[in-house]
Amino acid sequence: MRSLQDTCHKNAIEILKELAPQKVELYEYSDFNLIETGKDYTFPIHRDHINKLLSGVIYLNPEKNTGTIIYDDKKGKNPNEIEWKKNRSLFFSRTEKKSWHNYKGDRKNNRIVLVYNLMTTNTKAVCELEGINYNLIKFREFINPYIYRFFKKTF
């Protein structure tokens, strides 16, 4: 993991500088996850948690599957699939109204990805940068796991 961090970190910071330079000073730690989802699994349209300054996904296996789908809004307007290609990466810096996305299996193969995020614990500062209500965000982040658990949706 240390080698992976050493390899990826500098590039990820450069991407964050390009996409959201005001967030660079908020960086505190990196988060890596190797994720395998089933061939029939679908995660609902959502925006990432506010503590993610930069979100990245690297498609590992199989050769072909369904890539990440980006939308204009939570309702799924104007879907744009980032084509799955082994070792392709997608990075973005979440914003409150512009980073709606989801992912799903292709009904043939499980999906294996490496997720790499630049993180902060200073969510209040992120809210200030984005001009959003901190208390609303805290409430949403508290309730979303329950909404997803029972309704397979996010708020």
For each predicted feature, which ranges?
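Substrate-binding/active-site groove segments that recognize
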Residues: 56
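Catalytic core of Fe(II)/2-oxoglutarate
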Residues: 41, 50-53, 63-155
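Conserved aromatic-histidine-acidic binding/catalytic patches
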Residues: 4-7, 48, 79
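Non-heme Fe(II)/2-oxoglutarate
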Residues: 1-25
